[in-house]
Amino acid sequence: MSRMAEQQLYIHGGYTSATSGRTFETINPANGNVLATVQAAGREDVDRAVKSAQQGQKIWAAMTAMERSRILRRAVDILRERNDELAKLETLDTGKAYSETSTVDIVTGADVLEYYAGLIPSLEGSQIPLRETSFVYTRREPLGVVAGIGAWNYPIQIALWKSAPALAAGNAMIFKPSEVTPLTALKLAEIYSEAGLPDGVFNVLPGVGAETGQYLTEHPGIAKVSFTGGVASGKKVMANSAASSLKEVTMELGGKSPLIVFDDADLDLAADIAMMANFFSSGQVCTNGTRVFVPAKCKAAFEQKILARVERIRAGDVFDPQTNFGPLVSFPHRDNVLRYIVKGKEEGARVLCGGDVLKGDGLDNGAWVAPTVFTDCSDEMTIVREEIFGPVMSILTYESEEEVIRRANDTDYGLAAGIVTADLNRAHRVIHQLEAGICWINTWGESPAEMPVGGYKHSGIGRENGVMTLQSYTQVKSIQVEMAKFQSIF
């Protein structure tokens, strides 16, 4: 693909040049080619976007629930019509296999938008009787202008997960995509405008997180920030949001999630789940189950089943329908993952497979890392304690249920957890003791629109998806009505 035209900001229904004068490049990690130069939003651009959003939000919030619902449903239709086009762009920018982006990224994002479009008329207040002459009623009102700050692993899906409930509740959103993968969020802005969203209700500001993101979190005109990313960055976002104007925040942060295989489990099922929990999207999924706990007596058999499945991984041309494994999103990220792999070897973990870059067959110029499985791991190892965000699985053994629950919870993270067992009593007993916000029994990874997702501990604050997220983009106003004559004590 030839280099794209320079990408601008999207403010008030159209493209506009950044005032900062700064740019950055976005690359295709499959081959290292530059896809486009992208303009970076500065402080003045954030001010412009907020003013635009304030204007648009008043128009949007004044529409009826059904009018807003119809516009968002039109956007859903356009997303589905353009699925292939958007998936190809997402593959170029992220490196993910087209077999994945064409069936997951836009599809699941559109589902979430459709879900919230349908929920708009359900945003209702309540009536509370006090006595014969007085009652209270409540209104759910939009927050106003909110900000979304996205991560690089699911660019358009995250933009939809954040914008759908915000817009459904009558807010305007300013969205900052990751500087690593900024392209499809700009296309989403075009689609919203085409669907009839008033100008300013969805503005997109590409830029560097430490600058553009910070300006958004500090801006007094923004009522809430929804952030997806790492724990350290999340803490900065939260601190800035609180220090500036006590903004509400939603944080979807990192994870080091446990997958527990019990001795009664079907090991073929367990191996299939472990593969998806570690190597889907080349391991760049925040909910990955990278700490795989297996009974000591099952370890050898489980390892053989994992090795057999690693042989089915097909890396190569990311647009080949048979490819199911792509490069990492960038060269700096690849190098960071490789440092973790070296650390795992140094600390005594045994490499079962992988452990290096992938080369040959057109892969030499890309950010490729081989699917890597470590075994003979222990809880104190760096690769077991820290989030790697790459195709690296750690196999650990255990002896008892009590032991594995304790060790599974021995982490600062609490995003996800899963178990594989044939015993439903055990399944529920154990899941109820795991300190994680998203849990799976005999499956892994699905996050449907109806399911609230978010973390415990350092893995986040608040939830995305589900009814409660729509409500979190509103504020409740209570109004008392008195029909009798008011009595003053003065």
Curated annotation (Swiss-Prot):
Record gene name: betB
UniProt EC number: 1.2.1.8
Pathway: Amine and polyamine biosynthesis; betaine biosynthesis via choline pathway; betaine from betaine aldehyde: step 1/1
Source species: Escherichia coli O139:H28 (strain E24377A / ETEC)
Modified residues (Cysteine sulfenic acid (-SOH)): 286
UniProt site (Seems to be a necessary countercharge to the potassium cations): 248
Record keywords: Metal-binding, NAD, NADP, Oxidation, Oxidoreductase, Potassium
Family indicated by similarity: Belongs to the aldehyde dehydrogenase family.
Protein name: Betaine aldehyde dehydrogenase
An MF annotation (GO) of this entry: betaine-aldehyde dehydrogenase (NAD+) activity
Cystines in this chain: none
